[in-house]
Structure formats: structure tokens, C-alpha cells
């Protein structure tokens, strides 16, 4: 099975692209402000700051860790993803996250960034118009959600001062804002649908991998059962062979010492491990052949001393 690390590679590519985007944003901002700069110096400073922030905040390790978890799941290792799921649904985790959010709010308040500033910053963003001193104020998704929930009110104490020359068409502005909201909603829905499709594909791949693992495990279990049966059959056969040899040995007219020696060798055969048993059989056969060879040499010497000859028939 091939090892998949596509998610980690994608996460690393996104981080590298973010750094390049940060460099481009920094240099373009300096150009718009008419400030001369050294590109290599800007590149080095942005890289140093970017690497420090990504490492010190833990964002890089967090992204790479989640990517590694997804790759492990695609490779059939689900323990890390299960731990992450349990961690995200644990009440202690939720409590710890709430505590971190509260700490960040306290830190922002201590830096002079009050609730009003935080809310306005989360609801609006400012887009600079190139070549002009004016800018465009854009509403974020949070602002859209607040409008839909009825959490935006008009201050009645505000006195609108109309100018005779420049009159603002609020209806057209509202229609324009509504069209932007619809466009943003469509883009969000498209991204959400794309993520749903990707999640379904990942889920299908995980199910397919689980089926393959189940089939392989079933095949391994069958092989294990067959191996155990074969081992028991060999152990039984070895025991019956030893018993047969012992019975045949007792029927021979050999001396008791020889019988005892052969029985000791038979009793030393390993009944549990068939591989060791075959090695023991080989050793016994070698000893028997060696004994037969010595007897034949002795018999041959006696014939020669008695001036007899021998032939094989």
C-alpha cells in the first residue's frame, strides 16, 4: 500500500504561499506609500517575523498536525483521528478553549482595544483605493449575520444633515450592499459544497480502506487457523512416528543398552515445534547411519583377517 502524504504537502504549500503573499503585500504597500525599500531586506525581515509568529503561535504545528492526522486516516491508521475527535468533543477541551478566548479578550482590553473596537473590527474591514486618499468600507460575514438576526439598530439621536449639493442615495447603497451580501453568500455556499464533496470522498476512501483491512484480516485469520491445524497434525504425526519406532525397537533382539540409547534419543525429539523435531530426526538418522558404517567397517576387517571376501547382491 502506497504511503500518502498529500494533505501534509498541501498544508506546507499553503503556508509557503501565505509567506509569499505576505512579502508581496508588504512590498506593494511600501510602493503605494512611495517609500523606497530594499527587496532582499524586506524579504528577510518578513520571513524572520513570519517564521517566528507561525512557530511561536503554534499555528504551523497545528496545521501540519491536522494534515498528518488526515494522511494517517487515508493510510488506514485511524487512532490519531479518533483521539482528535474525542479531544474536540470533550468538555475539558471546550472549557480550556473558552478560557483561552477569555484570556485573549483580557489581553486585548489591557492593550486598550475595548469591546467597541473589537466588534467594529470584526464587523467591518477597510479597503484602500489605489491612487486615492479615500477608502471603501466592507461589511464582514459577522455583520451580515447580525443584520439577519436583527442585532443592528439605528441610533435615533443621530441627526442627518443633508447637503444641497451632495445627496447620498441610501437606497442604492443598500441595494449594492445587498448584492454584495448575496455574492458573498453564493461564494460561501460554493466553498461549503466543495468541502462537503471532498469530505464525502474522504469518507468513501476511509470506508473502502476499512473494507480492505477487514478482508485482509479475515484472510489472515483463515491462514492462522489453517497453520494451527497443520501444526497440530504435524505434532500428532511426530508423536505417532515416535511411538511406532519405540514399539518396533522393543521387538528387536538388540541389547538393552542399545535400546535404552535409542529410546533416549527418541525422547529428546521436540514434540511441540515441528521444525526442531525434523532436526532431531535428522540427528538420529545420522547417528544410525554412522553406527551402521562403523559396524560395516568392523565386519569388513574381520572378513579380511579371516581371508574371506564379500560381495553385494
Swiss-Prot record:
Predominant place of localization: host cell
Location of this chain's protein in the cell: Host cytoplasm
Residue numbers spanned by region Interaction with host EIF4G1: 208-313
Top-level division of the source organism's lineage: Viruses
Region RNA-binding: start-end pairs: 1-149
Summary of subunit composition and partner proteins: Homodimer. Interacts (via the coiled-coil region) with host ZC3H7B (via LD motif). Interacts with host EIF4G1.
Protein name according to UniProt: Non-structural protein 3
Organism: Rotavirus A (strain RVA/Human/United States/DS-1/1976/G2P1B[4])
Lineage: Viruses, Riboviria, Orthornavirae, Duplornaviricota, Resentoviricetes
Amino acid at each position: 500500500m502506497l504511503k500518502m502524504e498529500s494533505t501534509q504537502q498541501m498544508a506546507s504549500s499553503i503556508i509557503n504561499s501565505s509567506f509569499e503573499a505576505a512579502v508581496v503585500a508588504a512590498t506593494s504597500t511600501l510602493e503605494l506609500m512611495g517609500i523606497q525599500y530594499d527587496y532582499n531586506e524586506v524579504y528577510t525581515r518578513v520571513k524572520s517575523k513570519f517564521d517566528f509568529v507561525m512557530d511561536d503561535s503554534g499555528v504551523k504545528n497545528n496545521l501540519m498536525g491536522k494534515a498528518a492526522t488526515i494522511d494517517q486516516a487515508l493510510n488506514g491508521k485511524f487512532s490519531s483521528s479518533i483521539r482528535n475527535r474525542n479531544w474536540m468533543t470533550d468538555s475539558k477541551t471546550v472549557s480550556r478553549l473558552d478560557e483561552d478566548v477569555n484570556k485573549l479578550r483580557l489581553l486585548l482590553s489591557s492593550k486598550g482595544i475595548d469591546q467597541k473596537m473589537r466588534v467594529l473590527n470584526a464587523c467591518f474591514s477597510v479597503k484602500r483605493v489605489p491612487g486615492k486618499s479615500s477608502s471603501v468600507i466592507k461589511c464582514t460575514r459577522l455583520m451580515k449575520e447580525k443584520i439577519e438576526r436583527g442585532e443592528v439598530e439605528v441610533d435615533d439621536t443621530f441627526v442627518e444633515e443633508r447637503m444641497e449639493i451632495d445627496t447620498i442615495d441610501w437606497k442604492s447603497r443598500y441595494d449594492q450592499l445587498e448584492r454584495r451580501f448575496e455574492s458573498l453568500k453564493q461564494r460561501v455556499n460554493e466553498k461549503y459544497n466543495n468541502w462537503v464533496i471532498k469530505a464525502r470522498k474522504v469518507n468513501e476512501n476511509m470506508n473502502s480502506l476499512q473494507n480492505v483491512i477487514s478482508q485482509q484480516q479475515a484472510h489472515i485469520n483463515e491462514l492462522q487457523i489453517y497453520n494451527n491445524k497443520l501444526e497440530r497434525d504435524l505434532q500428532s504425526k511426530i508423536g505417532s512416528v515416535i511411538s511406532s519406532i519405540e514399539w518396533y525397537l522393543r521387538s528387536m533382539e538388540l541389547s538393552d543398552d542399545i535400546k535404552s540409547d535409542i529410546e533416549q534419543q527418541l525422547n529428546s525429539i521436540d514434540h511441540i515445534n515441528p521444525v526442531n523435531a525434523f532436526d532431531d530426526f535428522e540427528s538420529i538418522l545420522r547417528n544410525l547411519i554412522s553406527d551402521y558404517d562403523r559396524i560395516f567397517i568392523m565386519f569388513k576387517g574381520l572378513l579380511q583377517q579371516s581371508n574371506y571376501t564379500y560381495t553385494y547382491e
